[in-house]
C-alpha cells in the first residue's frame, strides 16, 4: 500500500495555471486591503465590556478627574465629556456632586450637539431651537424626545459612563 502512494506523482503545474493563481491571489489581497478600512469605518467603536462602561474623557482623550472637576465648576454645572461610543456626553453636577446620570449631548431632532446655557439653566440647540431642561427633558420642540440618559458613577477619581438601565425618571 505504501508503494502505491509513493509512486503517485502530482501532475506538473503549467505556467498558465501558476500565473492565474498568482494574479487571483494578488487581486484578492488588494480587494481585502481596500475594503477593510471601509467596513471598519461603519462599525461604531466599542463602548467597553457589558455593564462596565467607559471612563469619561476630555476633548484631548485624558480621563476627567472628579476632584478637579468639582473644584473648578459650579454646584449645578453641566460639563461636556467624551462618553459611550465616543458621543459627546454631559457630566451632571448637582449640589456640588456628580449626579448618578449623564446626558447624551446629541439633539434628538437632527443630531446637532446641544450646548449648555448656564445663564438660562437649560440646553439650547443651535440648529433648530429645541430646548431642554437641566435634566435633559425636552421643553420646546421640534425635538421629539428628551436627551438620552446614561448612567454615571464615580469610580475612584474618575466618572464612569454606562448604558442607562431602568425607566426614565423625567417622565414621572
UniProtKB/Swiss-Prot annotation:
Keywords: 2Fe-2S, Disulfide bond, Electron transport, Iron, Iron-sulfur, Membrane, Metal-binding, Thylakoid, Translocase, Transmembrane, Transmembrane helix, Transport. GO terms for cellular component: plasma membrane-derived thylakoid membrane. GO terms for biological process: photosynthesis. Its EC number is 7.1.1.6. It is found in: Cellular thylakoid membrane. It comes from the Bacteria. Disulfide bonds join 112-127. Binds 1 [2Fe-2S] cluster per subunit. The 4 large subunits of the cytochrome b6-f complex are cytochrome b6, subunit IV (17 kDa polypeptide, PetD), cytochrome f and the Rieske protein, while the 4 small subunits are PetG, PetL, PetM and PetN. The complex functions as a dimer. Belongs to the Rieske iron-sulfur protein family. The Rieske iron-sulfur protein is a high potential 2Fe-2S protein. This is Cytochrome b6-f complex iron-sulfur subunit. It comes from Synechococcus sp. (strain JA-3-3Ab) (Cyanobacteria bacterium Yellowstone A-Prime).
Amino acid at each position: 500500500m505504501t508503494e502505491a502512494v509513493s509512486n503517485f506523482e502530482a501532475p506538473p503545474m503549467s505556467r498558465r495555471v501558476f500565473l492565474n493563481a498568482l494574479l487571483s491571489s494578488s487581486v484578492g489581497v488588494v480587494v481585502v486591503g481596500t475594503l477593510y478600512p471601509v467596513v471598519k469605518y461603519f462599525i461604531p467603536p466599542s463602548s467597553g465590556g457589558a455593564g462596565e462602561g467607559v471612563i469619561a474623557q476630555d476633548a484631548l482623550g485624558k480621563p476627567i478627574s472628579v476632584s478637579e472637576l468639582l473644584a473648578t465648576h459650579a454646584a449645578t454645572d453641566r460639563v461636556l465629556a467624551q462618553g459611550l461610543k465616543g458621543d459627546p456626553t454631559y457630566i451632571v453636577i448637582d449640589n456640588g456632586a456628580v449626579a448618578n446620570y449623564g446626558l447624551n449631548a446629541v439633539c434628538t431632532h437632527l443630531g446637532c450637539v446641544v450646548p449648555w446655557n448656564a445663564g438660562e439653566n437649560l440646553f439650547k440647540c443651535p440648529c433648530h431651537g429645541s430646548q431642554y431642561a437641566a435634566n435633559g427633558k425636552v421643553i420646546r420642540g421640534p425635538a421629539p424626545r428628551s436627551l438620552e440618559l446614561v448612567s454615571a458613577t464615580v469610580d475612584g477619581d474618575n466618572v464612569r459612563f454606562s448604558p442607562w438601565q431602568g425607566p426614565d425618571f423625567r417622565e414621572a
